[in-house]
A protein has these predicted regions:
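Non-catalytic interfacial helical region
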Residues: 2-17, 22-173
Length: 173
């Protein structure tokens, strides 16, 4: 399933997430929400894999899917920061077993702006996970996002501070 950042609020029962787009602050916010939800679901250990360490990805997943006595609920956080979407990640995601493993949660954070329409890996993700687009917000979406960020303010001060921030920082999160 695909959603835009502004429509994302709760990961619900998903365990696999693909986060795309170029707005780093939005991606960071989404990752924090997802990690909190997964931790409350019993996923306590997190392994981060950068673009340079993709060889480890399959080994870590296999070790946790193999039915080991000591397997844990693991969050596998894969970070793709630049360039085309790596073939190693595509091949990894083409294996549907990763989406069905009860003790692996998957967060793929990617710099790609748009997800491809076809390909086994994207079809697997669309069917079994949640694809969250964190691209640049429109003006109205920025206002909604800012209102959520300022929810600690009293209702009477929100319009004053909110409009001032929007005027000074329009189109610049």
């Amino acid at each position: 399933m695909k959603v835009n950042f502004i429509n994302f609020s709760d990961p619900k029962d998903h365990k696999c997430f693909l986060i795309t787009g170029g707005e780093l602050i939005l991606k960071h916010e989404v990752v924090e929400i997802i990690l909190d939800k997964l931790k409350s679901a019993g996923f306590n250990e997190k392994v981060s894999i950068s673009q340079d360490e993709l060889e480890r990805m399959q080994e870590i997943a296999s070790r946790n899917m193999g039915g080991s006595l000591f397997q844990e609920n693991l969050i596998l956080h894969i970070k793709h920061t630049s360039g085309k979407f790596p073939e190693k990640i595509k091949l990894f995601l083409e294996n549907a077993e990763i989406f069905n493993s009860p003790n692996i949660a998957l967060i793929v954070e990617s710099s790609i702006e748009k997800t491809p329409a076809s390909g086994t890996w994207i079809k697997n993700f669309d069917a079994n996970g949640l694809i969250i687009n964190c691209s640049k917000l429109k003006i109205m979406e920025e206002k909604i996002w800012l209102k959520r960020q300022l929810n600690f303010l009293p209702k009477d001060l929100l319009p004053i501070f909110g409009s001032s921030i929007i005027q000074n920082n329009e189109s610049n999160l």
